[in-house]
Amino acid sequence: MWSGHRADLFGEPNQEIKKIMKLLNSLYRIVSESVTESGRDYNIVLDAEHFIYKAHFPGEPITPGVCIMQIAVELLSLHCGKPLAIDTVKNIKFLKIISPAETPGVCFSVSKVEAEDSKVKAQVSVSGGGETYAKLSLICKAK
């Protein structure tokens, strides 16, 4: 189990990556990270008390799609070891809502990562409790 500090596994993220990690240790924290055959899994816990959930939606918190995308980019940046930004969203499917009250822990699975020039293609699947919440196919560029 990861204590929340990347140094436990692979060393501290560099300063450039830290700059783009807008939601890490705020909206979510990483509880474990593991290498898989197809990429890497990041098990995260969402903070149901985060101010985003006060507005989206009061009494019925739902993780906004834009936050799911940002978390995916942050975790892909960690995976690649460099800061990335979305260049193109090839495909995105939000299959079920993610409520931090009902499902505080989810897994972001980063796979099919291909680096070409200054761009990185990847697929990210968000799942937990036997459910798939979202699937993203992204092309990111180095920041």
Residue ranges and their predicted role:
Residues 29, 111-143:
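HotDog/MaoC-like acyl-thioester-processing domains
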Residues 73-111, 119-121, 137:
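Hydrophobic beta-strand-centered segment that forms part of the acyl-chain substrate-binding groove
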Residues 15-19:
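Charged/polar low-complexity intrinsically disordered segments
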